Amino acid sequence: MGNNTSKPSRKPQRRQHGRKAQSVQISGPSGGLQMIPTPQRDGSGRPLVHGSFEMNRDQLLIAFQYMAEYLHRQGVNLCIYVAGGAVNTIYLRSRHTTGDVDFFGANDKSRHLRDASKYAQQRSTCQLGANWFNNSMSLFLTRTIEQDLIAAARRQNAVLFSKPGLAVYAVPWEYALCGKTDRLTKSDRRPYDTSDAVAYLSQCIKGNRGRAIQAQQVEAWARKYNKAVSRSVLIEIDAAYKRSHGEHGIMF
């Protein structure tokens, strides 16, 4: 398990040295979910699209460290739950980099998280980008599913980072796997989606005492989490798993 432990690069990674840290003003009292980062529009009212930069494991952990220090100074200790490339990069180490950190949790303290993420962006010696830390996945979670995921993630206890001020947990592996089955059914699937699915399937199998997962079980998880799945996608994932592990990971 990692403690103090994607997306293809869209722009070359740029490092900035000797950059002076700027002060961040803490917002007023929190009042429910706030989007992170705060949505912005240009002069004509169109949403601004921020560039993204690839971050490696060390850079992500340093950014989390800055966030933890900031939150600890504010007297808060928050838990968040992360999906996607940050999990692969930090915990599973199945990717070298990721373009952002997708998370949910601590909705009532989201202003603190927003300010902490800005502080980390300012302190970091690498370019994180304005969208490096975002909770847009919260928009797609019902209250019931979110609470279920939080409880399951705490039981799973796959910790990406934990210091006074901030603890970061991976989402349940079955949820992560279903996120990839959903993506693989769509036309905008990405080159790394299948390998990500294999990494998550491997964790599901470990939790199943080393036994392959029944296809019906994956389909049940997908229904539970409102994710798409198809037999052809499961066959594709299983074939990729067999190539890398020498045995089937999904039973049909």
Label each residue range with its predicted role:
Residues G2-F252:
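Compositionally biased terminal segments of proteins
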